[in-house]
Amino acid sequence: MRRNPYFELISPIISGLTRKSRILTKINLMIRVTEQESTYNDIDKMSVLEILKGINDEDKTVPHAVEKVIPQIEKLASAVAERMINGGRLFYIGAGTSGRLGVVDASECPPTFGVPFDWVVGIIAGGDTAIRRAVENAEDDDQQAWIDLQEFKIDANDCLIGLAASGTTPYVIGGLNTARKNGILTGCIVCNEGGPIAAESDFPVEVVVGPEFLTGSTRMKSGTAQKLVLNMLSTTVMIKLGRVKGNKMVDMQLTNHKLVDRGTQMVMDELNIDYEHAADLLIRYGSVRKAVESTHK
């Protein structure tokens, strides 16, 4: 019989569980909405169209779930903005899909808003290797997140947001717990209510999207919900930091032809001038903001 390639990974994890922890794990899985059985039966027998429609129907529910927790998001965004206005930074920690989403959001802030790369930092359990390939047991280490954060010299001026669909990831719990002890503002974006990650957060966001189309596959609705909240959070914070003028990304980095063209269009709209004049100003001053402000001197 061919040996399951994941046996060596799974076996020590299971054998390392005590009888008590197995019972607690079973109870925890029973109450976690993200692990509940899909409401769709026999999806392996569905047609392609039926599968696509089912996934789409489930996805439609996610924005409504996010809408319900806007008051929670408001509290978190306001607190983060206040810290960052006073010189603090924003850190995300997470494992798997949640960790990758944090890395994506952090990575988008410099090109979109022209901020330094260390203003918003995404850290994934297992390091950057885990962005592309799962790292064994990385999310189960409740000490490693704080070690990872220490590389960036995180301190009481900063903010830490834990990302975990389950709300129970040890890597995230440990990082938030130690951060709170060191006076760091903490928050989270999770998809189950009342979990240990929310308990370690000053400003929890608990967006419950229900069982996944594919049972337990939290990269789907849960991941979508987390991405929506991250979009709302980082965009709101950057607006409050003055990185937007009107409705435009005036500090975006002009790193390719598409973005230079977009920047030129922004200058055209703001100053009501033709494309050639706008392009000349953009080339001369190097940014949309400086090009626009140059005419007001």
Regions found by a protein language model. Give the residues of each.
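A short, well-structured juxtamembrane/interface segment
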Residues: 68-83
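Short terminal hydrophobic/aromatic SLiMs and anchors at protein ends
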Residues: 12-14
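Glycine-rich phosphate-binding loops that contact phosphosugars or nucleotide phosphates
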Residues: 91, 95-228, 237-241
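Polybasic, lysine-rich low-complexity intrinsically disordered segments
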Residues: 4, 10, 20-23
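Gly-rich Lys/Arg/Thr-decorated short loops/hinges at beta-loop-alpha junctions or inter-strand turns
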Residues: 56-62, 122-132, 260
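Cofactor-/ligand-binding subdomain signature composed of acidic, glycine-rich
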Residues: 27-65
